[in-house]
Amino acid sequence: MTKSKLRILAVGSQNSGVTYHRLALPLSIMEKEYCLITDTITEELLKEKNFNVVVINRFLESVPLLQLLEWRQKFGFKLVVDIDDYWSLFDKHLSAGTYRKLGITRIIKDFIRYADLVTTTHNRLYLEIIQINKNCEILPNALPFDKDQFTAIKKDNDRVTIAHTGSITHYPDIQQLKRPIEELAKSRVFRENTRMLLCGWNEFNKWHWNQMGNLYTANEKLEYKIIESLPVDLYMNFYLEADMLLVPLLDNKFNRLKSNLKALEAGAKNIPILTYKRAPYDDIPTIFEVDNWERDIKRMAFSKQMRDDFGYRNGEYVREHYDIFKINEARFAIYSKLIE
C-alpha cells in the first residue's frame, strides 16, 4: 500500500462552523502524511513543515492574496480554496454592508481565480465558480454519523420541542415565522404542549437576538428555551432536546446557493426538518415540505408518528448519501492528483 504524500496546511478561523465542517473535521480523519489546522499562516511555518497543499475557506483575512501567491511560488505548494457560500450577499443580509465596505466579494473572487483548485459543496455553486476558475471539484458537506457528537442520542421531553438553530445571519429568514407563530400562540393546546428552542444566542448581536427571541416565542407567550452559541465540537448539543427543526430560508440567490447541512444535522438526530422544497433542500427527498408554516408546524407538533416517520427517513437518507468517510475518499483522490 502506497503511503500518502499529502502534507496539508488548513487555515481558518477558530471556532468557525465553516472551518470545522469544510476543513478541520474532514481533514482530521482523512488519510495523509501530515496535517496542521490553524488560524495563522507564516513564511516560517511554510518553510519548516514543507507543505504541498494549503487549503483555505473563501479567503484569508490576515494575509493578502499577493503575499500568498509569492509564498506559493517560493515553496511550491498547491493552493486549494474551498467555497461553501455564494460571495455576493443579498441586501438584507446582516453582513452586506461590511462586504461592500471592505470589498469582500471582489477579494473572494480573486482567491477563486488564482487557486490551483477550488472545491465546493454542490453543483449550483460549481456552475458559478467555473465562470471564474475551471479547476473546480464538488465535495459535499458530510458528517461522521453515529460518532462523537453526531450520534442519535436525544433527551426525552415533556413537551414537543421545536428548534431553530443557526447564527444571527438568519435574522431576515426567521421573519417569515412571525405571523405563523403569533397565530400558533393563540391555541391553548399548542401553548400547553410545545416548547420553542432557539439555539445560537450570542451577546455580540444582542439587539438582533432579542428581536429573534421575541418573534420565535410570540413575545414569550409560548414556553421557550434559549441556548447560547457553543464551541464547534459541541454544537450538536443544540439538537439533544429538539423534536423537529424549522429552516425558513428566504428565496434568493444567496440562500439557493447554500448547502443542505441542516438536513444532515437533523438526520444525525433522526428528527424531521421542515423547510421549503427548493434549493438548497430540494435534493433531500426526506424533508417535510412546508406550504403553510402555521398549519405544518401544528401538524408535525401534534403527531408523534409523523415526527418519527420523517425523522427516521431523513436519518437513513443522509447516512447513505452524506457519509464523511465516503466523501473523504474523493477528497483524498482529488488532493493526491493535485500534487502529482
Regions flagged by a language model, labelled:
Residues 1-60:
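N-terminal pre-catalytic "stem/leader" segment of glycosyltransferase-like enzymes
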Residues 14-29, 144-148, 155-237:
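Conserved catalytic-core segment of nucleotide-activated headgroup transferases in glycan assembly
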Residues 70, 98-118:
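Membrane-proximal helix-turn-helix segments that form the acceptor-binding/catalytic region
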Residues 72-90:
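Active-site proximal beta-strand in glycosyltransferases
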Residues 113-149:
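Donor nucleotide-sugar binding/catalytic pocket of nucleotide-sugar-dependent glycosyltransferases
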Residues 172, 231-238, 243-265, 274-284:
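Nucleotide-sugar-dependent
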Residues 302-337:
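A charged, aromatic-enriched C-terminal amphipathic alpha-helix characteristic of glycosyltransferases
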